[in-house]
Amino acid sequence: MSEDEAAQAPGPSLSEQDQQSAVQRVAALPLIRATCTAVSEAYSAAKDRHPLLGSACRLAEHCVCDLTTRALDHAQPLLSHLQPQLATVNDLACRGLDKLEEKLPFLQQPSETVVTSAKGVVASSVTGMVGLARQGRRWSVELKRSVSHAMDVVLEKSEELVDHFLPMTEEELAALAAEAEGPEVGSVEEQRKHQGYFVRLGSLSTRLRHLAYEHSLGKLRQKKHHAQDTLAQLQETLELIHRMQCGVTPITPARPGKVHELWEDWSQRPLENGRRRHSQAELETLVLSRNLMRELQSTVDALETSVRGLPPSAQEKVAEVRRSVDALQAAFADARRFGDLPAAVLAEGRGSMARAHACVDELLELVVQAMPLPWLVGPFAPILVERPEPPPDLEALVDEVIGGPDPRWAHLDWPAQQRAWQAQHGEGTVLSGNIPEEEPEPPSRPKHTLMPELDF
Protein backbone atom coordinates (compact mmCIF):
# COMPACT_ATOMS: atom_id res chain seq x y z
CA MET A 1 0.00 0.00 0.00
CA SER A 2 1.34 3.42 -1.02
CA GLU A 3 1.48 6.43 1.24
CA ASP A 4 -1.51 8.11 -0.48
CA GLU A 5 -3.66 5.06 -0.04
CA ALA A 6 -2.63 4.80 3.52
CA ALA A 7 -3.53 8.45 4.05
CA GLN A 8 -6.92 7.96 2.39
CA ALA A 9 -7.67 4.77 4.37
CA PRO A 10 -10.20 5.32 7.15
CA GLY A 11 -8.50 5.51 10.58
CA PRO A 12 -9.72 4.00 13.79
CA SER A 13 -12.32 5.79 15.86
CA LEU A 14 -11.55 7.82 18.99
CA SER A 15 -12.93 5.15 21.28
CA GLU A 16 -10.78 2.54 19.61
CA GLN A 17 -7.75 4.78 20.09
CA ASP A 18 -8.66 5.25 23.75
CA GLN A 19 -9.22 1.54 24.20
CA GLN A 20 -5.96 0.72 22.46
CA SER A 21 -4.25 3.39 24.54
CA ALA A 22 -5.45 1.88 27.86
CA VAL A 23 -4.42 -1.63 26.88
CA GLN A 24 -1.15 -0.41 25.48
CA ARG A 25 -0.42 1.59 28.61
CA VAL A 26 -0.86 -1.48 30.78
CA ALA A 27 1.22 -3.63 28.46
CA ALA A 28 3.86 -0.92 28.14
CA LEU A 29 4.57 -0.76 31.84
CA PRO A 30 8.22 -1.77 32.31
CA LEU A 31 7.45 -4.17 35.11
CA ILE A 32 4.60 -5.86 33.17
CA ARG A 33 6.63 -5.96 29.98
CA ALA A 34 9.63 -7.48 31.74
CA THR A 35 7.41 -10.07 33.40
CA CYS A 36 5.74 -11.00 30.12
CA THR A 37 9.10 -11.19 28.39
CA ALA A 38 10.51 -13.47 31.09
CA VAL A 39 7.45 -15.74 30.91
CA SER A 40 7.62 -15.85 27.10
CA GLU A 41 11.31 -16.71 27.13
CA ALA A 42 10.77 -19.46 29.68
CA TYR A 43 7.86 -20.81 27.60
CA SER A 44 9.90 -20.81 24.40
CA ALA A 45 12.90 -22.42 26.10
CA ALA A 46 10.68 -25.17 27.48
CA LYS A 47 9.24 -25.88 24.03
CA ASP A 48 12.71 -26.01 22.50
CA ARG A 49 14.10 -28.37 25.15
CA HIS A 50 11.19 -30.83 24.98
CA PRO A 51 9.94 -31.65 21.43
CA LEU A 52 6.83 -33.48 22.62
CA LEU A 53 5.94 -30.61 24.94
CA GLY A 54 6.57 -28.17 22.08
CA SER A 55 4.19 -30.08 19.77
CA ALA A 56 1.52 -30.16 22.44
CA CYS A 57 1.95 -26.47 23.15
CA ARG A 58 1.70 -25.55 19.44
CA LEU A 59 -1.45 -27.62 19.12
CA ALA A 60 -2.88 -25.88 22.17
CA GLU A 61 -1.94 -22.49 20.72
CA HIS A 62 -3.68 -23.31 17.46
CA CYS A 63 -6.82 -24.41 19.29
CA VAL A 64 -6.82 -21.32 21.48
CA CYS A 65 -6.41 -19.07 18.45
CA ASP A 66 -9.33 -20.73 16.67
CA LEU A 67 -11.53 -20.50 19.73
CA THR A 68 -10.59 -16.87 20.26
CA THR A 69 -11.34 -15.99 16.63
CA ARG A 70 -14.73 -17.66 16.73
CA ALA A 71 -15.54 -16.03 20.06
CA LEU A 72 -14.68 -12.61 18.70
CA ASP A 73 -16.80 -13.20 15.60
CA HIS A 74 -19.82 -14.12 17.71
CA ALA A 75 -19.20 -11.33 20.24
CA GLN A 76 -18.65 -8.56 17.70
CA PRO A 77 -22.33 -7.48 17.51
CA LEU A 78 -22.52 -7.36 21.30
CA LEU A 79 -19.29 -5.35 21.51
CA SER A 80 -20.59 -2.89 18.95
CA HIS A 81 -23.79 -2.48 20.99
CA LEU A 82 -21.80 -1.94 24.22
CA GLN A 83 -19.34 0.51 22.69
CA PRO A 84 -20.37 3.50 24.91
CA GLN A 85 -20.15 1.45 28.08
CA LEU A 86 -16.75 0.07 27.08
CA ALA A 87 -15.52 3.58 26.42
CA THR A 88 -16.61 4.65 29.90
CA VAL A 89 -14.91 1.66 31.48
CA ASN A 90 -11.77 2.37 29.48
CA ASP A 91 -11.78 5.97 30.69
CA LEU A 92 -12.15 4.87 34.30
CA ALA A 93 -9.35 2.34 33.83
CA CYS A 94 -7.05 5.03 32.47
CA ARG A 95 -7.77 7.28 35.44
CA GLY A 96 -7.13 4.44 37.86
CA LEU A 97 -3.91 3.66 36.07
CA ASP A 98 -2.82 7.29 36.41
CA LYS A 99 -3.43 7.22 40.16
CA LEU A 100 -1.66 3.87 40.45
CA GLU A 101 1.39 5.23 38.64
CA GLU A 102 1.43 8.20 40.99
CA LYS A 103 1.31 6.02 44.10
CA LEU A 104 3.69 3.35 42.76
CA PRO A 105 6.42 5.11 40.80
CA PHE A 106 8.44 1.92 40.44
CA LEU A 107 5.90 0.72 37.84
CA GLN A 108 7.53 3.14 35.39
CA GLN A 109 11.03 1.99 36.28
CA PRO A 110 12.89 -0.86 34.59
CA SER A 111 12.84 -4.19 36.34
CA GLU A 112 16.57 -4.06 36.94
CA THR A 113 16.20 -0.80 38.83
CA VAL A 114 13.30 -2.19 40.89
CA VAL A 115 15.27 -5.31 41.77
CA THR A 116 18.31 -3.25 42.71
CA SER A 117 16.20 -0.96 44.91
CA ALA A 118 14.51 -3.94 46.54
CA LYS A 119 17.87 -5.51 47.26
CA GLY A 120 19.05 -2.26 48.83
CA VAL A 121 15.94 -2.00 51.00
CA VAL A 122 16.23 -5.62 52.09
CA ALA A 123 19.92 -5.25 52.83
CA SER A 124 19.27 -2.07 54.84
CA SER A 125 16.46 -3.79 56.78
CA VAL A 126 18.60 -6.83 57.48
CA THR A 127 21.47 -4.61 58.61
CA GLY A 128 19.14 -2.73 60.94
CA MET A 129 17.75 -5.97 62.36
CA VAL A 130 21.25 -7.30 62.90
CA GLY A 131 22.15 -4.09 64.71
CA LEU A 132 19.04 -4.35 66.88
CA ALA A 133 19.82 -7.99 67.62
CA ARG A 134 23.36 -7.13 68.67
CA GLN A 135 22.11 -4.26 70.81
CA GLY A 136 19.48 -6.53 72.36
CA ARG A 137 22.14 -9.11 73.08
CA ARG A 138 24.24 -6.48 74.85
CA TRP A 139 21.21 -5.37 76.82
CA SER A 140 20.37 -8.96 77.73
CA VAL A 141 23.92 -9.53 78.98
CA GLU A 142 23.75 -6.36 81.06
CA LEU A 143 20.29 -7.29 82.34
CA LYS A 144 21.48 -10.78 83.21
CA ARG A 145 24.43 -9.33 85.09
CA SER A 146 22.14 -6.90 86.95
CA VAL A 147 19.61 -9.61 87.80
CA SER A 148 22.43 -11.90 88.95
CA HIS A 149 23.78 -9.22 91.25
CA ALA A 150 20.29 -8.39 92.55
CA MET A 151 19.57 -12.07 93.24
CA ASP A 152 22.84 -12.36 95.14
CA VAL A 153 21.97 -9.33 97.25
CA VAL A 154 18.41 -10.55 97.92
CA LEU A 155 19.52 -14.06 98.86
CA GLU A 156 22.32 -12.80 101.09
CA LYS A 157 19.95 -10.40 102.84
CA SER A 158 17.33 -13.15 103.23
CA GLU A 159 19.89 -15.51 104.70
CA GLU A 160 21.07 -12.79 107.10
CA LEU A 161 17.49 -12.11 108.22
CA VAL A 162 16.82 -15.82 108.71
CA ASP A 163 20.02 -16.19 110.74
CA HIS A 164 19.07 -13.15 112.83
CA PHE A 165 15.39 -13.83 113.53
CA LEU A 166 15.50 -17.65 113.40
CA PRO A 167 18.97 -18.69 114.61
CA MET A 168 20.31 -22.16 114.05
CA THR A 169 19.25 -24.91 116.39
CA GLU A 170 21.73 -26.89 118.43
CA GLU A 171 21.51 -29.83 116.01
CA GLU A 172 22.36 -27.60 113.04
CA LEU A 173 25.27 -26.01 114.88
CA ALA A 174 26.61 -29.45 115.79
CA ALA A 175 26.29 -30.63 112.17
CA LEU A 176 28.03 -27.48 110.94
CA ALA A 177 30.86 -27.97 113.43
CA ALA A 178 31.25 -31.59 112.33
CA GLU A 179 31.49 -30.52 108.69
CA ALA A 180 34.07 -27.86 109.57
CA GLU A 181 36.34 -30.52 111.07
CA GLY A 182 36.63 -32.28 107.69
CA PRO A 183 39.52 -31.54 105.31
CA GLU A 184 39.26 -28.60 102.91
CA VAL A 185 35.78 -27.52 103.87
CA GLY A 186 34.98 -23.88 103.09
CA SER A 187 32.89 -21.54 105.15
CA VAL A 188 29.13 -21.32 104.80
CA GLU A 189 29.41 -18.07 102.83
CA GLU A 190 31.89 -19.62 100.38
CA GLN A 191 29.67 -22.66 99.90
CA ARG A 192 26.67 -20.43 99.24
CA LYS A 193 28.56 -18.46 96.57
CA HIS A 194 29.24 -21.66 94.61
CA GLN A 195 25.58 -22.71 94.65
CA GLY A 196 23.06 -21.75 92.01
CA TYR A 197 20.20 -19.40 92.67
CA PHE A 198 17.52 -22.07 92.67
CA VAL A 199 19.59 -24.31 94.94
CA ARG A 200 20.13 -21.45 97.38
CA LEU A 201 16.49 -20.41 97.18
CA GLY A 202 15.31 -23.98 97.74
CA SER A 203 17.62 -24.51 100.69
CA LEU A 204 16.56 -21.15 102.13
CA SER A 205 12.89 -22.10 101.84
CA THR A 206 13.46 -25.52 103.42
CA ARG A 207 15.53 -24.06 106.22
CA LEU A 208 13.00 -21.29 106.83
CA ARG A 209 10.17 -23.82 107.07
CA HIS A 210 12.18 -26.00 109.44
CA LEU A 211 13.19 -23.10 111.68
CA ALA A 212 9.64 -21.73 111.71
CA TYR A 213 8.38 -25.18 112.66
CA GLU A 214 10.90 -25.46 115.51
CA HIS A 215 10.12 -21.90 116.63
CA SER A 216 6.39 -22.64 116.67
CA LEU A 217 6.86 -25.85 118.62
CA GLY A 218 8.97 -23.96 121.14
CA LYS A 219 6.22 -21.41 121.61
CA LEU A 220 3.67 -24.18 122.01
CA ARG A 221 5.85 -25.91 124.62
CA GLN A 222 6.14 -22.65 126.56
CA LYS A 223 2.37 -22.29 126.60
CA LYS A 224 2.01 -25.91 127.62
CA HIS A 225 4.39 -25.49 130.58
CA HIS A 226 2.68 -22.27 131.61
CA ALA A 227 -0.76 -23.87 131.47
CA GLN A 228 0.39 -26.95 133.38
CA ASP A 229 2.05 -24.80 136.04
CA THR A 230 -1.20 -22.86 136.53
CA LEU A 231 -3.19 -26.10 136.59
CA ALA A 232 -0.85 -27.51 139.23
CA GLN A 233 -1.32 -24.43 141.40
CA LEU A 234 -5.09 -24.70 141.06
CA GLN A 235 -4.89 -28.39 141.92
CA GLU A 236 -2.83 -27.50 144.98
CA THR A 237 -5.38 -24.85 145.98
CA LEU A 238 -8.30 -27.26 145.68
CA GLU A 239 -6.41 -29.86 147.71
CA LEU A 240 -5.63 -27.31 150.42
CA ILE A 241 -9.28 -26.16 150.60
CA HIS A 242 -10.42 -29.78 150.84
CA ARG A 243 -8.01 -30.49 153.70
CA MET A 244 -9.03 -27.34 155.52
CA GLN A 245 -12.69 -28.30 155.21
CA CYS A 246 -11.89 -31.72 156.65
CA GLY A 247 -9.91 -30.17 159.53
CA VAL A 248 -6.59 -31.67 158.38
CA THR A 249 -3.43 -29.61 158.54
CA PRO A 250 -2.18 -28.93 154.99
CA ILE A 251 1.00 -30.70 153.97
CA THR A 252 3.64 -28.45 152.48
CA PRO A 253 4.69 -29.87 149.09
CA ALA A 254 8.24 -30.12 147.81
CA ARG A 255 7.67 -27.03 145.67
CA PRO A 256 5.19 -24.86 147.57
CA GLY A 257 3.10 -22.52 145.46
CA LYS A 258 1.51 -19.17 146.07
CA VAL A 259 -1.32 -20.61 148.20
CA HIS A 260 1.00 -22.39 150.64
CA GLU A 261 3.18 -19.30 150.86
CA LEU A 262 0.08 -17.28 151.66
CA TRP A 263 -0.98 -19.70 154.43
CA GLU A 264 2.51 -19.85 155.90
CA ASP A 265 2.63 -16.08 155.98
CA TRP A 266 -0.80 -16.01 157.61
CA SER A 267 0.19 -18.58 160.24
CA GLN A 268 3.18 -16.45 161.25
CA ARG A 269 1.10 -13.33 161.87
CA PRO A 270 0.49 -12.27 165.49
CA LEU A 271 -2.75 -13.30 167.15
CA GLU A 272 -5.64 -10.85 167.39
CA ASN A 273 -7.43 -11.23 170.74
CA GLY A 274 -5.87 -14.63 171.17
CA ARG A 275 -6.93 -16.06 167.78
CA ARG A 276 -6.33 -15.67 164.09
CA ARG A 277 -9.00 -14.70 161.68
CA HIS A 278 -9.56 -17.70 159.41
CA SER A 279 -12.04 -15.79 157.27
CA GLN A 280 -9.37 -13.35 156.15
CA ALA A 281 -7.04 -16.17 155.02
CA GLU A 282 -9.90 -17.98 153.29
CA LEU A 283 -10.93 -14.85 151.42
CA GLU A 284 -7.37 -14.17 150.27
CA THR A 285 -7.08 -17.78 149.14
CA LEU A 286 -10.26 -17.51 147.09
CA VAL A 287 -9.09 -14.24 145.51
CA LEU A 288 -5.79 -15.86 144.60
CA SER A 289 -7.67 -18.82 143.12
CA ARG A 290 -9.75 -16.53 140.93
CA ASN A 291 -6.59 -14.81 139.71
CA LEU A 292 -5.11 -18.18 138.79
CA MET A 293 -8.29 -19.08 136.92
CA ARG A 294 -8.19 -15.83 134.93
CA GLU A 295 -4.55 -16.46 134.08
CA LEU A 296 -5.40 -19.99 132.99
CA GLN A 297 -8.31 -18.71 130.93
CA SER A 298 -6.04 -16.31 129.03
CA THR A 299 -3.64 -19.18 128.35
CA VAL A 300 -6.51 -21.32 127.06
CA ASP A 301 -7.61 -18.44 124.82
CA ALA A 302 -4.13 -18.33 123.28
CA LEU A 303 -4.13 -22.10 122.79
CA GLU A 304 -7.59 -22.01 121.25
CA THR A 305 -6.47 -19.40 118.75
CA SER A 306 -3.33 -21.33 117.82
CA VAL A 307 -5.12 -24.65 117.18
CA ARG A 308 -7.79 -23.15 114.96
CA GLY A 309 -6.31 -24.78 111.87
CA LEU A 310 -5.63 -28.17 113.51
CA PRO A 311 -7.75 -31.33 113.23
CA PRO A 312 -10.93 -31.53 115.35
CA SER A 313 -9.25 -33.89 117.82
CA ALA A 314 -6.72 -31.20 118.82
CA GLN A 315 -9.39 -28.53 119.05
CA GLU A 316 -11.47 -30.83 121.27
CA LYS A 317 -8.56 -31.10 123.72
CA VAL A 318 -8.47 -27.33 124.17
CA ALA A 319 -12.26 -27.15 124.34
CA GLU A 320 -12.25 -29.70 127.17
CA VAL A 321 -9.72 -27.62 129.12
CA ARG A 322 -11.89 -24.54 128.60
CA ARG A 323 -15.01 -26.31 129.86
CA SER A 324 -13.15 -27.41 132.98
CA VAL A 325 -11.89 -23.89 133.68
CA ASP A 326 -15.31 -22.32 133.04
CA ALA A 327 -17.04 -24.78 135.39
CA LEU A 328 -14.51 -24.19 138.15
CA GLN A 329 -14.67 -20.43 137.69
CA ALA A 330 -18.47 -20.50 137.96
CA ALA A 331 -18.21 -22.47 141.22
CA PHE A 332 -15.76 -19.96 142.74
CA ALA A 333 -17.59 -16.86 141.49
CA ASP A 334 -19.74 -16.15 144.58
CA ALA A 335 -17.70 -17.97 147.23
CA ARG A 336 -16.64 -15.82 150.20
CA ARG A 337 -15.33 -18.61 152.40
CA PHE A 338 -14.45 -22.29 152.17
CA GLY A 339 -17.87 -23.31 153.47
CA ASP A 340 -19.49 -21.91 150.32
CA LEU A 341 -17.73 -24.60 148.24
CA PRO A 342 -19.42 -28.03 148.44
CA ALA A 343 -17.19 -31.08 148.71
CA ALA A 344 -18.64 -32.47 145.48
CA VAL A 345 -17.63 -29.31 143.62
CA LEU A 346 -14.08 -29.56 144.99
CA ALA A 347 -13.82 -33.24 144.05
CA GLU A 348 -15.13 -32.56 140.56
CA GLY A 349 -12.74 -29.62 140.23
CA ARG A 350 -9.72 -31.73 141.20
CA GLY A 351 -10.73 -34.34 138.64
CA SER A 352 -11.29 -31.76 135.90
CA MET A 353 -7.89 -30.15 136.60
CA ALA A 354 -6.22 -33.56 136.29
CA ARG A 355 -8.01 -34.19 132.99
CA ALA A 356 -7.07 -30.73 131.73
CA HIS A 357 -3.42 -31.43 132.62
CA ALA A 358 -3.56 -34.63 130.57
CA CYS A 359 -5.29 -32.86 127.66
CA VAL A 360 -2.49 -30.31 127.41
CA ASP A 361 0.07 -33.14 127.30
CA GLU A 362 -1.91 -34.95 124.60
CA LEU A 363 -2.26 -31.74 122.58
CA LEU A 364 1.50 -31.22 122.32
CA GLU A 365 2.06 -34.90 121.56
CA LEU A 366 -0.52 -34.70 118.77
CA VAL A 367 1.18 -31.67 117.24
CA VAL A 368 4.65 -33.23 117.38
CA GLN A 369 3.74 -36.72 116.10
CA ALA A 370 0.85 -36.16 113.73
CA MET A 371 2.25 -33.79 111.09
CA PRO A 372 4.23 -30.84 110.13
CA LEU A 373 1.22 -28.54 110.09
CA PRO A 374 0.29 -26.15 107.25
CA TRP A 375 0.08 -23.23 109.65
CA LEU A 376 3.57 -24.08 110.95
CA VAL A 377 5.42 -24.77 107.70
CA GLY A 378 3.74 -22.07 105.69
CA PRO A 379 2.06 -20.19 104.31
CA PHE A 380 1.99 -18.07 107.44
CA ALA A 381 -1.66 -17.01 107.14
CA PRO A 382 -3.76 -20.12 107.86
CA ILE A 383 -7.13 -18.50 108.41
CA LEU A 384 -8.31 -15.15 107.12
CA VAL A 385 -11.58 -14.01 108.65
CA GLU A 386 -13.48 -11.13 107.10
CA ARG A 387 -15.14 -8.94 109.71
CA PRO A 388 -17.86 -6.34 109.08
CA GLU A 389 -16.07 -3.94 111.42
CA PRO A 390 -12.80 -3.86 113.38
CA PRO A 391 -12.90 -5.89 116.60
CA PRO A 392 -13.24 -3.83 119.79
CA ASP A 393 -9.94 -5.12 121.21
CA LEU A 394 -7.94 -4.40 118.05
CA GLU A 395 -5.71 -1.89 119.85
CA ALA A 396 -4.78 -4.47 122.48
CA LEU A 397 -4.04 -7.07 119.80
CA VAL A 398 -1.62 -4.83 117.89
CA ASP A 399 -0.21 -2.87 120.82
CA GLU A 400 3.29 -3.38 119.49
CA VAL A 401 2.43 -1.26 116.45
CA ILE A 402 -0.20 1.28 117.52
CA GLY A 403 -0.15 1.15 121.31
CA GLY A 404 3.29 0.63 122.71
CA PRO A 405 4.41 -0.54 126.16
CA ASP A 406 4.34 1.39 129.39
CA PRO A 407 6.62 4.43 128.86
CA ARG A 408 8.26 3.79 132.23
CA TRP A 409 9.58 0.44 131.00
CA ALA A 410 9.87 1.12 127.27
CA HIS A 411 13.67 0.82 127.38
CA LEU A 412 13.53 -2.62 129.07
CA ASP A 413 13.11 -6.03 127.49
CA TRP A 414 10.19 -8.30 128.36
CA PRO A 415 11.75 -10.17 131.35
CA ALA A 416 12.95 -6.86 132.81
CA GLN A 417 9.46 -5.39 132.43
CA GLN A 418 8.02 -8.37 134.32
CA ARG A 419 10.51 -7.92 137.16
CA ALA A 420 9.78 -4.18 137.34
CA TRP A 421 6.05 -4.80 137.49
CA GLN A 422 6.42 -7.46 140.19
CA ALA A 423 8.62 -5.13 142.25
CA GLN A 424 6.02 -2.37 142.04
CA HIS A 425 2.94 -4.55 142.69
CA GLY A 426 4.52 -7.12 144.98
CA GLU A 427 2.53 -6.04 148.02
CA GLY A 428 -1.19 -5.64 147.34
CA THR A 429 -3.19 -3.02 149.19
CA VAL A 430 -6.10 -3.99 151.44
CA LEU A 431 -9.49 -2.36 151.13
CA SER A 432 -11.66 -1.33 154.02
CA GLY A 433 -13.65 -4.10 155.59
CA ASN A 434 -10.67 -6.48 155.45
CA ILE A 435 -11.34 -7.20 151.75
CA PRO A 436 -8.07 -7.08 149.81
CA GLU A 437 -7.99 -5.17 146.60
CA GLU A 438 -7.73 -7.48 143.62
CA GLU A 439 -4.26 -7.61 142.22
CA PRO A 440 -3.93 -5.56 139.02
CA GLU A 441 -3.34 -7.58 135.90
CA PRO A 442 0.30 -7.74 134.81
CA PRO A 443 1.28 -6.24 131.47
CA SER A 444 0.62 -8.63 128.62
CA ARG A 445 3.42 -9.57 126.33
CA PRO A 446 3.34 -7.59 123.06
CA LYS A 447 1.96 -9.63 120.18
CA HIS A 448 3.92 -9.57 116.94
CA THR A 449 1.97 -8.57 113.89
CA LEU A 450 4.23 -9.86 111.11
CA MET A 451 3.79 -13.57 111.88
CA PRO A 452 1.08 -13.75 114.58
CA GLU A 453 0.52 -17.47 114.16
CA LEU A 454 4.04 -18.08 115.49
CA ASP A 455 3.04 -16.48 118.83
CA PHE A 456 0.84 -18.93 120.70
UniProtKB/Swiss-Prot annotation:
Task: Spell out the Pfam families in the cross-references.
Answer: Perilipin (PF03036)
Region (Essential for lipid droplet targeting) residue spans: 1-173
Q: Which GO terms describe its cellular component?
A: cytoplasm; cytosol; lipid droplet; mitochondrion
Highest taxon of the lineage: Eukaryota
Assigned protein family: Belongs to the perilipin family.
| Region named Recruits mitochondria at the lipid droplet surface | 438-456
Q: Which Gene3D superfamilies match?
A: Flagellar protein FliS, Perilipin, alpha-beta domain
How does it get modified post-translation?
Answer: Phosphorylated by PKA. Phosphorylated on serine in skeletal muscle at rest or upon lipolytic stimulation.
Q: What stretch or stretches form a coiled coil here? A: none
Q: What is this protein called?
A: Perilipin-5
Keyword Phosphoprotein (UniProt): yes
Originating gene: Plin5
Region annotated Interaction with PNPLA2 and ABHD5 sits at 185-456
Q: Where is this region: Interaction with LIPE?
A: 1-108
Q: How does it assemble?
A: Homooligomer. Interacts with PNPLA2; prevents interaction of PNPLA2 with ABHD5. Interacts with ABHD5; targets ABHD5 to lipid droplets and promotes interaction of ABHD5 with PNPLA2. Interacts with LIPE.
UniProt keyword annotation of Phosphoprotein present: yes
Q: Where in the cell is it found?
A: Lipid droplet; Cytoplasm; Mitochondrion
- Role this protein plays: Lipid droplet-associated protein that maintains the balance between lipogenesis and lipolysis and also regulates fatty acid oxidation in oxidative tissues. Recruits mitochondria to the surface of lipid droplets and is involved in lipid droplet homeostasis by regulating both the storage of fatty acids in the form of triglycerides and the release of fatty acids for mitochondrial fatty acid oxidation. In lipid droplet triacylglycerol hydrolysis, plays a role as a scaffolding protein for three major key lipolytic players: ABHD5, PNPLA2 and LIPE.
Residue ranges, annotated region (Disordered):
1-20, 420-456
Sequence positions bearing Phosphoserine: 2, 148, 324
Q: Could you list this entry's UniProt keywords, alphabetically sorted.
A: Cytoplasm, Lipid droplet, Mitochondrion, Phosphoprotein
Q: Which GO terms describe its biological process?
A: lipid droplet organization; lipid storage; negative regulation of fatty acid beta-oxidation; negative regulation of lipase activity; negative regulation of peroxisome proliferator activated receptor signaling pathway; negative regulation of reactive oxygen species metabolic process; negative regulation of triglyceride catabolic process; positive regulation of fatty acid beta-oxidation
